[in-house]
Amino acid sequence: MALVPMRLLLDHAAENGYGIPAFNVNNMEQIISIMQAADETDSPVILQASRGARSYAGENFLRHLVLGAVETYPHIPIAMHQDHGNSPATCYSAIRNGFTSVMMDGSLEADAKTPASFEYNVNVTAEVVKVAHSVGASVEGELGCLGSLETGQGEAEDGHGFEGKLDHSQLLTDPEEAVEFVNKTQVDALAVAIGTSHGAYKFTRKPTGEVLAISRIEEIHRLLPNTHLVMHGSSSVPQEWIDMINEFGGAIPETYGVPVEEIQKGIKSGVRKVNIDTDNRLAITAAFREAAAKDPKNFDPRHFLKPSIKYMKQVCADRYQQFWTAGNASKIKQLTLDDYAAKYAKGELTATSRTSVAV
């Protein structure tokens, strides 16, 4: 089989009440880790790459690594997603390079630093949706800026993230605006701002409702029951990996991520895609440091890379179980981009809100 549209996976997740972790990839070892975990847990897969990852790996290398996963695991439905596309051009180049899903992040302007107006966000996102849907590709939009409700600041990821401080009105997705945004853009998925941010340093204490607004997801889901919601910046930052890194020479200070139980609450309220990167980075770093410390004379790269696959695979398998993804890959009938282009053309996948239906 070929890669599948992300919409196919999100629809199945919604129908069956589970979420799908979307793991960022940059190299072969990360893809192997994810696919081994998915194979062992019978889980559908969303691989995603940022602009930085595409630049780091190179378009051709990245594309063939992903196709290698498809050929090796033909029984697992896999979507390849562009994370945080900063402009329509970025999204179109991703589709040309084989991505079956793109994120048009119009919450920021094309410089990926300046918070954008609602009108700008709607216009660029709707433009991408029109083009992507014509070829069957899925589109994720974002409303609100990702950042900390504690500090008002965000953490740039591969150069993508606002600068300075924002107030809560910009850091929390407005439910009524979300309805208007979905109706005007027809996105397949909506990333919501609830106080999470990129990187390891998300919260200075275990998050509560004051700094992690899971209740905002519930409000949005009530108005948009048929829209697939997305949580960004949702690594849990497990203490075990931080302890291991620091045991073997690291210096990561105390920090807190998004507790798994909070993500599970989100999944029960319409979250279908959960973005995770930092947890895997921590596991890989722990493996490298441990391997180097225990055998300092070894200079074979495989000595460091093999344990990194093992540890990252552990993280991925845990998330597939915790998000109730496990056991669902074999239940999904794989469809193509052409199949979905036909569905969009016929209006079968038109987004509706509770408000618009009532009218």
From Swiss-Prot:
Gene name for this UniProt entry: fbaA
Organism superkingdom: Bacteria
Keyword Iron-sulfur attributed: no
Its biological purpose: Catalyzes the aldol condensation of dihydroxyacetone phosphate (DHAP or glycerone-phosphate) with glyceraldehyde 3-phosphate (G3P) to form fructose 1,6-bisphosphate (FBP) in gluconeogenesis and the reverse reaction in glycolysis.
Protein family according to the UniProt entry: Belongs to the class II fructose-bisphosphate aldolase family.
Pathway(s) of this molecule: Carbohydrate degradation; glycolysis; D-glyceraldehyde 3-phosphate and glycerone phosphate from D-glucose: step 4/4
Alphabetized GO MF terms: fructose-bisphosphate aldolase activity; zinc ion binding
Annotated InterPro entries: Aldolase_TIM, Class_II_FBP_aldolase, FBA_II, Fruct_bisP_Calv
Official protein name in the record: Fructose-bisphosphate aldolase class 2
Binding site for Zn(2+) 2: 105, 142
Binding site for D-glyceraldehyde 3-phosphate: 50
Cofactor notes: Binds 2 Zn(2+) ions per subunit. One is catalytic and the other provides a structural contribution.
Active-site positions on this chain: 83
Enzyme class: lyase
